[in-house]
Amino acid sequence: MLDSVPQGDIANVDPALSASSFAVLAPSDLSVELSSDCNGFTGNTTRRSLFDLSATDVDQLFDHNLRCDFNENTGYTVTASGARSNDAAFITEFTFSTGVASSASLTIVDEFDLPRTDINDLFAAYIGDALFDDLALSSGVEALIRQLILELADASWSNLVDPEALYDVTSQKVSYRSRHPDGTPSAELTAAVMFPVLATASNFVTRDRVVILMHATGSTPSNLDNTDAWYILANLFASRGYLVITPDNYGRGGTDNMPETYLMAKRTGLNTLDLIGQVLDDTRYSEVYSGADIAIIGYSQGGHSAVGLHLLLETQGPDHWSVKEVYSGGAPHNLYQTVRGVMQHLDGSCDDGPYCRYVDEETTVPYATDRIFPGFLSYTDTGLQFEDVVTNEDINPAFVTAFLTDDPVTDHFKAMLQLSSFTQLLSAEDNFGASTAKVHLYPSEFDRLVPFDNTLELANLLETALTVDFHERRCNSAGYEAIFNVTEKVGVIHTLCGLSVLNQALADFK
């Protein structure tokens, strides 16, 4: 077994949280059946190709997805049994125990209303101040490209700049019942929930979509901060009549004393699944949203989370929920190759490859050491400690060599990265075949932070099972190219493209 949520030694799993999973390394010719002693058991397996491990007897990653009706204070076993083409038998048993159901529930921590006249001005104020702070450009470079960015705003961000808000909006910071990365109960996770103020709304029509916003790097939506692009975006959608749910990643907001589950798709998805269920079951929101249809929107880290949530809802979500739209841009969908590209750059073996071409030691490497590595090394059994991988904020040269030469010590770390890589799914049809969602994907050839091939590979995979709109031109205009040629600073094009993606998503939700 590679990984599981909950971990196998957990004895107090919240019985109200019915979704769980475990992943194993396996040979490709293994057929598997799942069974369990829990009531209402349903299970399926997501298979991924597995690359660059020292072991030659395993070449696939089996992610077993489960749902059960649990009782309190009860032990359970889930069994994955099967045989290879040579009739050799394999079996994996996943065991855990439930405790007493948590008394925690969806709790409103903070709440206020924002007039629609103020909402109309939020994004324009962000462009004039917070955006350039986020870009952190030198004064000389900012002077060169400020006009280019303002021209881009005029051409590509019109819905954000002039949103024509229909309603005042209530902003809520909430906490909810969920789980820590090891599967133990948690009541500390937080989120922002936004919706129109119905008391001042005339002729309001209940919407048939709930909008799930998956935040990008550095955002904490529950802070309800009007300089945070994701808080602003949540207001804009809510001002058009939608119920908007915007979770904080574990490690932000109410759990900010812990490492973030950064790009850990399964754990982020399970937390979000728990949140959505509690919001939609709460009658306080029933006048705003009535139905079972879901739209998921994310960019960068959030774009990765959006695809991960879509996959989780198709494999483990309630049967009556239906994902209708997914918007994902600038995301490391091939997380393994993205990290490998960093290693190749540091090793000097890049040779202009698509995943290492623009790696920058000032910006890209800290994304690995400060954001990606801490969660994977803290919450999963890779056999590695953080100090084995990082020393004085740099990736250890010995670890880089071990990673690129397929040293056995790196096997589980590599496999965990691949468990969060969507481009390695063997069959989109097996996992998304029943979905009616339209998936919008946005890359930029000028993005120095997240390589273009991440999105290209995912589009090629998903189009076999889903309706995919690959917006290749959205962030590849002459304006983006001009900015790309003026500055080599990593993250500038990435950030600007994100705003174009969000502008398009907002345009689709009248």
Regions found by a protein language model. Give the residues of each.
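Short beta-strand/loop motif that positions the catalytic acidic residue
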Residues: 435, 440-443, 447
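Accessory cap/linker subdomain of secreted extracellular hydrolases
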Residues: 127, 131, 139, 328-432
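Alpha/beta-hydrolase active-site loop
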Residues: 262-285
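N-terminal non-catalytic regions of secreted/periplasmic and cell-surface proteins
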Residues: 1-37, 77-81, 90-100
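Short, surface-exposed "cap/lid" segments of acyl-processing enzymes
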Residues: 181-190, 194-240
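Catalytic-loop region of hydrolases
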Residues: 2-4, 25, 44, 48-50, ...
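C-terminal catalytic histidine-bearing segment of alpha/beta-hydrolase fold enzymes
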Residues: 456-457, 464-510
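Conserved alpha/beta-hydrolase "acid-adjacent" motif
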Residues: 448-454
